[in-house]
């Protein structure tokens, strides 16, 4: 029998009639709950949005999320798991969205202010960031959203779905590689944040997992346990 750790919560089923959702009560949709009178005070919540395939999530992802939260004084950072990453369709076989979400839950289980979000799993279909940002604003209308991107992704923003709308919904936070300053389209409000850079990639980690090479200190321990329990990456995907 497969043992599910205490922090594991599978993505909820897709809700068909979204007009009837009580967004504050249905916390699993956005992994956001209504702020209490004292939790965030009177200021608008400052929320980082860090999307990715996270196949698997690794230490580099956490270092980015934690340090951006610190540098920008964010209330929280949501690690948003892509349901169907449109930029990677056909490139390789992905782990299931539910498994990837479970791994992100495991990765952030001990991290204050860093949360797993299944908003894109709940919505279903291709994962377009502009839709995710609009969903988050619907849940918490007064929040400020900060979209966290690597330099390469930021440089290609004009090719994303509805870039003009996206530009109105968030501030772009660019995390560049050392010595590299990526050009970002001028239509976007941009801030650059420097974080410690680790030479870790999900591609390499999948290959290591397939050969049973050690993942310690590259992947959070709860994620390593889950990879083993779920039997992921046995064929290097």
Per-region residue spans from a language model:
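Extreme N-terminal basic, low-complexity initiation segments
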Residues: 1-9, 13
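Short Gly/Ser/Thr- and charged-rich N-terminal loops/segments
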Residues: 13-14, 58
């Amino acid at each position: 029998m497969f043992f599910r750790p205490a922090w594991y919560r599978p993505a909820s089923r897709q809700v068909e009639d979204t007009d009837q959702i009580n967004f504050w009560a249905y916390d699993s949709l956005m992994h956001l709950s209504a702020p209490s009178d004292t939790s965030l005070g009177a200021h608008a919540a400052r929320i980082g949005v860090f999307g990715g395939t996270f196949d698997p999530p690794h230490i580099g992802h956490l270092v980015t999320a934690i340090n951006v939260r610190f540098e920008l004084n964010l209330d929280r950072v949501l690690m948003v798991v892509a349901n169907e990453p449109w930029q990677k369709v056909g490139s390789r076989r992905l782990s299931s969205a539910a498994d990837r979400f479970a791994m992100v839950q495991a990765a952030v289980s001990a991290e204050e202010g860093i949360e797993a979000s299944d908003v894109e799993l709940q919505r279903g279909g291709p994962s377009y960031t502009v839709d995710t940002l609009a969903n988050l604003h619907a849940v918490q209308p007064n929040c400020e959203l900060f979209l966290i991107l690597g330099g390469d992704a930021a440089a290609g923003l004009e090719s994303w779905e509805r870039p003009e709308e996206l530009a109105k919904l968030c501030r772009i936070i660019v995390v560049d590689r050392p010595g590299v300053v990526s050009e970002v389209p001028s239509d976007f409000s941009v801030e650059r944040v420097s974080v410690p850079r680790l030479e870790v990639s999900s591609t390499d980690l999948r290959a290591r997992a397939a050969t049973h090479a050690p993942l310690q200190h590259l992947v959070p321990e709860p994620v390593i346990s889950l990879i083993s329990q779920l039997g992921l990456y046995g064929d290097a995907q």
